[in-house]
Every structure is written in C-alpha cells, then in structure tokens.
Amino acid sequence: MEGGCGSQWKAAGFLFCVMVFASAERPVFTNHFLVELHKDGEEEARQVAAEHGFGVRKLPFAEGLYHFYHNGLAKAKRRRSLHHKRQLERDPRIKMALQQEGFDRKKRGYRDINEIDINMNDPLFTKQWYLFNTGQADGTPGLDLNVAEAWELGYTGKGVTIGIMDDGIDYLHPDLAYNYNADASYDFSSNDPYPYPRYTDDWFNSHGTRCAGEVSAAASNNICGVGVAYNSKVAGIRMLDQPFMTDIIEASSISHMPQLIDIYSASWGPTDNGKTVDGPRELTLQAMADGVNKGRGGKGSIYVWASGDGGSYDDCNCDGYASSMWTISINSAINDGRTALYDESCSSTLASTFSNGRKRNPEAGVATTDLYGNCTLRHSGTSAAAPEAAGVFALALEANLDLTWRDMQHLTVLTSKRNQLHDEVHQWRRNGVGLEFNHLFGYGVLDAGAMVKMAKDWKTVPERFHCVGGSVQNPEKIPPTGKLVLTLKTNACEGKENFVRYLEHVQAVITVNATRRGDLNINMTSPMGTKSILLSRRPRDDDSKVGFDKWPFMTTHTWGEDARGTWTLELGFVGSAPQKGLLKEWTLMLHGTQSAPYIDQVVRDYQSKLAMSKKQELEEELDEAVERSLQSILRKN
C-alpha cells in the first residue's frame, strides 16, 4: 500500500507494502507464468511465446512484464513444471520466468438451504425494494438507496462503464445486451474477448450476470427489473471460473482497460471460513496502485469490494482486498435494517447497501437478471451489496466526471446515513470530529440522491500524504489475562513535507503470534478518543504458528480527525482457555491531507455532515491562526 510495511515495491509513484503470506498447505502450480524480457516489445514477446508454445498478454501496469500461458499444461498440479520454466529461463531474451502459484478466491453469494427457485417473466421492478422500499416482504418503508431522487435529477449512469470482475456475464441477456460494453470486456479464464459464463447444470456461474443486472439492467423494456444506474454501460471481466486463482490473472483483471472502465466491482475474495488471512499478492498490489494513480486519465480507478460473508465467525480486516485503502468496502443490511446473518464486521468497511440473508420470504432477496435470459429474486450475500454501490457511484460520476477515487470515498463518508439500520452487537458511535459510524455498517447506507447533489458541486480534495507515525519494535508478551497496552506519541510528521493533519485511512502494521490466533483481540484508540476494533475473535481460527506477519490492519473510523497525539494499542485474548502471545512489531501509518478537505466545498444542506465538518474545520483554522499570532507576539516580546 502507499506506506511502509513488509517488503516494498515502488510503482506508479506509490511506495506500497507487499503482504506476507504463509501457509502449511502444499502449493499448487498453474499453467500461467510471469515473464520479464530484457527488451520490452509486444512483437518480440509474441515471437518468444510462440517459439516455446505459449500464448501471451502484456501486463499494462508494468514495463517489460508479460503473462505467458500454456494450454497444453494442466491448469493446476502439485509439482512445478521445471521443464517449461528452465526452457524459458535458458532463452537469452528472457530475464525472468516465474510459474504462478494458485490460491482460492470465493464468490460472495450467500445461499440459504431453503431458498426458493423462482424465475419471473413479468417485470420485477415492484419487487426491487432496495430501490424503492414501500414495505415489500415485511420491509421498512423508506429504507432504500434513494435512487428516485437521483433519477428525478436526471442521473442514470450515462457515460459511465462498470466492470464486473466475476465468472462472466450473459451479455446476450435482453436486459443487459443494450448496455453491454464489448470493447471493455475480456475473458481472462479462456484468454479471449468473450466473457460468457461456462455452462453448469446448477447455474453456479450465474454470479456475475446477477451482479451486472443490479448495476446496468435496462429500464422500461418489460424484462426483469431496473439497474441502479440503468443507462450505464457494463463490461464483463471473466476471471473467477477456474480451479485456482493466480496473481497474474487478478492483476490483469484489476488493470484491464482503465481508461474505458470507470468502476470495478468485485463480489469475491479469500475463503470466508473464519480462519483465513489472505489478500492481494505483489502483481495485484502493483496493478491496484497503478489503477488509483493512472486510471481514468489520472483521476483513479474506483474499486468496490464486497466486505465478506463469514458472519460473526470472521473479520473482514483479515481480508486484504476489503481492508485495502484503495477499495471501497461495502457491507449489507436486509430490508428491515437488520444485519444479514453472513455479515462480517471490521473497521475498514466504509458503508453499506442491501441484500438478504435472514428472511425466508423469497421476495426479500435481490431481484436481478439471471442466466439465459431469465430473472431471479434470490440474489444475496455481500455479493449483491457491492454492485448496488457501484451503481450509486456511477450516478455520482455522471453528475461529476472529475471525481477522483478519493473524492468518491469522501462523498461516501459524508452522504451515507444511519437511516434505520440496526446492529444488535455494535452500537453507533461518533468519532472525534462528530462523524457517526458503526463497526459493521461503516458510515451508514448509501444515499444516491444526497451523493449526486453533493457531487455536482464537489471540488477535488487536497493532495494526500503518508506519514510513519511511529513504531514499536521491541517484542512484548501478551498476557493470558488482562491486556497488553502500548502507546505511541506522534506529531504526524508536522514540520515535514509529508505532514498529515486531517486523517483519511490509518493502518496499524502488526507482527504478532499467539497460541491460538482466533482468540486474539486488537483495539486501537486515536488521540481524539475514537476506538477502532482492528481484530475481533474468530472462533474457527486455530492457528498457532503463522500469526500475522506485517499485516496492515486498517480503520476508517478516525476519518477527519487530527492525527497528532497519543495512539493506544490494546491486545488481549477472548476465549474460554488461557492463551499466550508475542507482539513483535507495531508500526503506525497515517494517510490524509495537510489542508482542510472540506473548507472550500459548497454547502447546500446546513444540517448535513459536510456542513458540520466544514464548520469544525473553519473553527480549527481560526484557533490555529490565533495560536500562531500569540506565539509570534510572545517571540517579539
């Protein structure tokens, strides 16, 4: 990421850390190779690949790097293909050849055992309660995305393209065909430009088609329902449907056509089994850094991620995609405002939309498109939540195409609402600058009407800086009872070029081991008194060897706060049996702006979070100006 942790890569103007992973399982090797040539050039790469029996694609985010794939090799096996690796390495034109290891990535579509298979031929618009909640399926009237207001203002997603990174989309579907962007689509599983889902008897590969319909299903055509941004274009990026994922396929997907695709929607991630700690590898991190730095003509690609379906047994801060600063992590609520049974909670979630996962009423699910021209009422999971958010962001982009990836995060914080959301476990709290948040729902449910109105007048936020706020490097034991409490006092790099005054994201980069990792609980409190739960108990995680190795736990809960002062880290165990642990490292990474981000913004609603934040910034600037004047007078005397 954009600061120091683990080993570091310098790419696209960003210094970011490579997450370190360890596993006791035997590695799986795929038919994909990362190849670096001494002399960069696509013609030479094609020639080299052809001579060795490989297909080839250039990686757009790095010079000299190519994706070689061999269709004659098994897609996954336990042993390396040393013959092909050595054959490539002996070629004098090749600088490096690395066979890609495979790893698991799972779709986040929750499936209830009592789900009802209903295919509707009639329009489903009246059943799309997440667009207009009138109380359908015993829902709470008014608890929806407020798209009506955005549509009435004339914003329907026109001119915006959303890429669905998934198992493909049925681009022949009559509700999707008109809005399908073929030029921005690709199949990385089959290496061709036709990302159509692979047929299975159980319709397992319907996931991407359902997500696409939520975003871009056409309006007023008497087919299925209506997309959140029904005049937007949708691109299919097929990359999930294979035995194992590889770093090179993830990176290629995330970096695909960043000048054509505005928003990338991902409803997948590491296995949600409550015991996995995993995230993007080196190439994917590099691709994401390149995307936020160079995508959309330098305004930055917008990555929307489903926060996870592991429920109370998991923590989405153990998912390096959902907890990345470069993604907008989205959780879900059901139609009456309660949490879904599969919802994971963590401090990195920015906001929420809607799905199902608690009610047996079939109409409480998400209505959308399905395979082979069909419709469905049963889409669910945070898989359904992320595309809804992508649709809302498309509406905001139509209102203001100059929005950067960071602008979109600021707008999300400022316009999301508590509404009638109810978390039975975690209370709603206010941070040090008065912004209300929840550990599961983030800053609340997206409000499309409020977002497009604010986006119209929005001025790009100031430059972002990164500061290492301090570090604890001496090993400290975590007691079986009680807590290990550590403090770091920081000036947030004040007086230096990278001073951070107004926070956006905060990372606690931690190396720690425990006799049972799942019983470990980590909290961090800011100088302004905001407590973030960085890691909650995961009862299924029995790990006693790997722990966390330079893992960047992230919080958005201190958004807008002053980073200067004393930060407190607390580590303890929650569980029935006594455990022991050792904290080896804690590094505090601060990310934000030097100047006030909202002081120049236009305020239309004087009851809004923007009005409150701007008022506070003006008061703080005045106080600091008075303090500087007093110090100047004292020095003269």
UniProtKB/Swiss-Prot annotation:
Task: Cite the active-site annotation.
Answer: D166, H207, S383
Please state what class of enzyme this protein is: hydrolase
List glycan-bearing residues: N374, N513, N523
Q: Where is the Peptidase S8 domain?
A: 128-452
What's a single GO MF annotation on this record? serine-type endopeptidase activity
Task: List the catalytic activities from the record.
Answer: Release of protein hormones and neuropeptides from their precursors, generally by hydrolysis of -Lys-Arg-|- bonds
PANTHER family assigned to the protein according to its UniProt record, in alphabetical order: NEUROENDOCRINE CONVERTASE 2, PROPROTEIN CONVERTASE SUBTILISIN/KEXIN-RELATED
What name appears for this protein in its UniProt entry? Neuroendocrine convertase 2
Which gene produces this protein? Pcsk2
